[in-house]
Amino acid sequence: RDNKTATFDFSACSLEWQNTVAQAISQIDGLKTTQLPSPVMAVLTALEMKCTRYKVREDVMDQIVQEGGLEYATDVIIHLQQIDIKWDYANNVIIILPSGIAPDYLEQYSRFELRLRKHLSLAEESLWQKCAQKLIAAIPHIPEWRQPLIALLLPEKPEIAHEIAQRLLGQKKLPSLEWLKIVATDEHILASLEKYHEPYAIFDDYYCGAIWSATVLQEQGVAALPRFAPYTASDYCADVLRHINHPFALTLLIRVAGHTKRCHDRMTKACAAFPHAAMAALTELLGQKEENSWQIGRASCRER
């Protein structure tokens, strides 16, 4: 940085990790191959993500999977969760330490980490099972605030999200538990997680809100619609919902149509696109005695 040579401080790490970090530092200017131990590759990846202008992207994970295999890539992700990097800019010191302290904000997962999700989804069953077992076995050794990533990587096993939620919801407020909404399916756990919709709002995120909303619907279908209720007035989630031909999606949009002009416009477009779902939604609203919402939706349908 600023053409100055940084120094490293990893004295807070265990002896085993100190040896790993020292080996990684010796490889910074060398050839980085999957012949390196996976913990060393994890340190090198963490340094790239934290200390360079160009963040580690999906193609880096693609290369690791291609050269080292999916199990190796899984090991890299597991080890990556166990370390953290801080940069003391004033003294130009890069500090590597255990990742035990949770931030008080919702930390986004890197594109590098999330790319493993795609590779796992494309793997043959036997290989997927091996990688899934690695990830599940690693959970007790990963700091609590980073454990939701494991559930996120294994949407085929919502019970992992349920176990993490049941274990951590009553202990402390961890912003990262918001991520469990993407893969959890249990109604009671989802209801408990609702307290996390403010101020974190994973489905209202500027960068990925629409993507995660669409992902949940693709993986879980219309059964996932109720969890979007707190986010229906937001642009990113609602822009996805207006393309869903289902009465409950229309019900959600009609309920918030009076909030803003954009909310009303989305509801109007959805009613025009899916008139039968709109009529079913109006019938449901009338049955629940939601008079104001019914009047707004009815007026929109009559305009069409």
Model-derived segments and spans:
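Residue-level detector of conserved catalytic or cofactor/ligand-binding positions
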Residues: 295-303
